[in-house]
Swiss-Prot record:
Its EC number is 4.2.1.20. It catalyses: (1S,2R)-1-C-(indol-3-yl)glycerol 3-phosphate + L-serine = D-glyceraldehyde 3-phosphate + L-tryptophan + H2O. Gene3D superfamilies: Aldolase class I. Tetramer of two alpha and two beta chains. It comes from Listeria innocua serovar 6a (strain ATCC BAA-680 / CLIP 11262). GO terms for molecular function: tryptophan synthase activity. Keywords: Amino-acid biosynthesis, Aromatic amino acid biosynthesis, Lyase, Tryptophan biosynthesis. This is Tryptophan synthase alpha chain. The alpha subunit is responsible for the aldol cleavage of indoleglycerol phosphate to indole and glyceraldehyde 3-phosphate. The gene is trpA. It is an enzyme of class 4 (lyase). The keyword Transmembrane does not apply. It holds the Pfam family Trp_syntA. The keyword Lyase applies. Belongs to the TrpA family.
Amino acid sequence: MTKTLTKKLANKDHASVVTYIMGGDGGLDNLEEQLLFLEKSGVSAIEIGIPFSDPVADGPVIQLAGLRALKERVSLEAILTKLATSKVQIPLIIMSYINPIFHLGIPKFIEMVQKTPVKGLIIPDLPYEHRTLITPELKGTDIALIPLVSLTSPKERLEEIANQAEGFIYAVTVNGTTGVRNEFNTHIDTHLAYLKSISPVPVLAGFGVSSIEHVEKFARVCDGVIIGSKVVQMLHDGETRELGTFLQNAAEVQIEN
């Protein structure tokens, strides 16, 4: 069964743009408004980060957003409860460290997720070899566990991950944490092009994407981008009009490969 998330991100003439927000940054009551705004801006899907006290993959902008959400006492369960009444039509993706999921309980977590528009899960601190902690619970559902692939992964590992991939492949474009970047590794284009050539699902580039030029760069070698820190910062600063224009322009970038 092809997952809804794969269908949404595949076979497009234009780059798929996935945005990231921190759930509860600005208060949980604003979450639905943020989601509807991003949907209206033309994005293909939205990642919702779950605040956590030890966010090892997060850069400074997202770390601060997580702290703001934690001060509001936002939890994974509270976010999923809120999402159960969401009117958003595009797929949502939960990005959570494994600890909050364990705390809630994996069966309860999956049960709650299925009552929401969530169609994908990203767990950055769950090693690929341990994915079976989650995947048995996802059998028969429309929810994909999204693999993250690093720049340093050898071809054999890329092929192994691609063969098992569902939803899409999250290609991490830098060695390090999230955050705005001005430059990327000179080998990134070759890496992404190879990954796309072997992947049965869309390949999206994430970590550091913050400009239309970045979107255009990655649209030449993969299926789209994930934009996080820039979105989080602009929402926090109240720059919604500027953000909406940026995302609309990003979603109009044509795929060149």
